Amino acid sequence: MEVGGDTAAPAPGGAEDLEDTQFPSEEAREGGGVHAVPPDPEDEGLEETGSKDKDQPPSPSPPPQSEALSSTSRLWSPAAPENSPTCSPESSSGGQGGDPSDEEWRSQRKHVFVLSEAGKPIYSRYGSVEALSATMGVMTALVSFVQSAGDAIRAIYAEDHKLVFLQQGPLLLVAMSRTSQSAAQLRGELLAVHAQIVSTLTRASVARIFAHKQNYDLRRLLAGSERTLDRLLDSMEQDPGALLLGAVRCVPLARPLRDALGALLRRCTAPGLALSVLAVGGRLITAAQERNVLAECRLDPADLQLLLDWVGAPAFAAGEAWAPVCLPRFNPDGFFYAYVARLDAMPVCLLLLGTQREAFHAMAACRRLVEDGMHALGAMRALGEAASFSNASSASAPAYSVQAVGAPGLRHFLYKPLDIPDHHRQLPQFTSPELEAPYSREEERQRLSDLYHRLHARLHSTSRPLRLIYHVAEKETLLAWVTSKFELYTCLSPLVTKAGAILVVTKLLRWVKKEEDRLFIRYPPKYSTPPATSTDQAAHNGLFTGL
């Protein structure tokens, strides 16, 4: 535990006035997000301080011990369904070549394994799956032994290690960690890994494959996906905001320009077009959805984050691409057809998601209209300044400096508005500044990520949820606060007192309120597309299967 311990903090003075305000809503495919699964009651390695409050948003209860977790989560990169060409040309070695006896392998803070019910290795975060086949066999034996007694194994705790299991259909996912993450947070990462696999093959294809042959080697169909999974896990550890908050991050942009870009997307329609997205560096500029296609089945932020990570990959650094995409939250058994293109040789990326296989040329025509419209608006220069194109090829492209808040002592923060109109819930969003000194080095960013995970687990504890946490660590002070209107995590200088922290947070909330039109998409645009030219397209593409 960090030096100084934790002390309960009262609600900041003047907080009620602030709460009355409305807060609307290299290669990368990392991510984004669903609400993390709430911590298990057993996860109480840290002393909890603070008090319950009726303003605390409800936290869902964990599933029963024998219940299989079936939901999927945000932060994946899609590819093609079975027997369809994949979008990414990458191939990967599947990590380091060590085994459990290798010191370098044992020194890793966290391992993730994927294997089939029959014990067939599929993926390992570190080390080759061949060298780890015996280890994965032991995992399969543990799961089978518990299942034979009519139960399901969820987690094993051993000193400072956690071993978390997740059964998803014919696949078994295991996380072994000595980080400060709770079992529930590790389970959320496993759900993200599973969703990555589903987005590549679709859930129905995976089930059909193993129903036909239980010991099938799924790596044949996932060739090249190992590095994608590696990047996914790296991004969740280094930039946990999207996963913890279940939201997407937008590029800060003046509202008139963002509205003009949204109107431009609304005017560019094609038969079967369901969703149009403008993004840069894995962050959202604006998006427009078709009224009818997504009216009853809203696009989950996890699926949107999936798309943002996907279009930010180096595979789409130039030119245009056309590929099928499975969105596991929308329909894990079906897929869309996606048109992806870089605009005017800039990092700005256009994504058009449709339901018709033969719509490539219609989508390409939309791309030309969008390019012409953006030049007419002078949007490229504004987007270049807003998104810092010098580093926009990565998903961690800087958006703005924490110095813009004008609150001395504030180092970093994560902010998600909660009290937003219903039509904004289609697009949960959060904002955070770029990480600057003293969090320039990877180990420092990792340490800050651990602190955010720890605070999140305690705020959303199922046994004793907290509303406000003031935590004094060795190198920084942190304040986490959740109300009915927002969820906030702040990192402050270690010299900031409790009273000073309250003043900094109050100033931050006022700044966010002032800048909300620039930080968030407050009015997501909608449009209607022309009728489809073929009556059998919906049945063919499987988009609405199971809805």
Swiss-Prot record:
<keyword id="KW-0007">Acetylation</keyword>
<keyword id="KW-0597">Phosphoprotein</keyword>
<dbReference type="GO" id="GO:0005737">
    <property type="term" value="C:cytoplasm"/>
</dbReference>
<dbReference type="GO" id="GO:0019086">
    <property type="term" value="P:late viral transcription"/>
</dbReference>
<dbReference type="Pfam" id="PF19036">
    <property type="entry name" value="Fuz_longin_1"/>
</dbReference>
<protein>
    <recommendedName>
        <fullName>Vacuolar fusion protein MON1 homolog B</fullName>
    </recommendedName>
</protein>
<dbReference type="GO" id="GO:0035658">
    <property type="term" value="C:Mon1-Ccz1 complex"/>
</dbReference>
<feature type="modified residue" description="Phosphoserine">
    <location>
        <position position="59"/>
    </location>
</feature>
<dbReference type="GO" id="GO:0016192">
    <property type="term" value="P:vesicle-mediated transport"/>
</dbReference>
<dbReference type="GO" id="GO:0019085">
    <property type="term" value="P:early viral transcription"/>
</dbReference>
<feature type="region of interest" description="Disordered">
    <location>
        <begin position="1"/>
        <end position="106"/>
    </location>
</feature>
<dbReference type="Pfam" id="PF19038">
    <property type="entry name" value="Fuz_longin_3"/>
</dbReference>
<comment type="similarity">
    <text>Belongs to the MON1/SAND family.</text>
</comment>
<dbReference type="InterPro" id="IPR043970">
    <property type="entry name" value="FUZ/MON1/HPS1_longin_3"/>
</dbReference>
<feature type="compositionally biased region" description="Low complexity">
    <location>
        <begin position="1"/>
        <end position="15"/>
    </location>
</feature>
<dbReference type="GO" id="GO:0006623">
    <property type="term" value="P:protein targeting to vacuole"/>
</dbReference>
<feature type="modified residue" description="Phosphoserine">
    <location>
        <position position="61"/>
    </location>
</feature>
<feature type="modified residue" description="N-acetylmethionine">
    <location>
        <position position="1"/>
    </location>
</feature>
<dbReference type="InterPro" id="IPR043971">
    <property type="entry name" value="FUZ/MON1/HPS1_longin_2"/>
</dbReference>
<dbReference type="InterPro" id="IPR043972">
    <property type="entry name" value="FUZ/MON1/HPS1_longin_1"/>
</dbReference>
<dbReference type="InterPro" id="IPR004353">
    <property type="entry name" value="Mon1"/>
</dbReference>
<dbReference type="Pfam" id="PF19037">
    <property type="entry name" value="Fuz_longin_2"/>
</dbReference>
<comment type="subunit">
    <text>Interacts with CCNT2; down-regulates CCNT2-mediated activation of viral promoters during herpes simplex virus 1/HHV-1 infection. Found in a complex with RMC1, CCZ1 MON1A and MON1B.</text>
</comment>
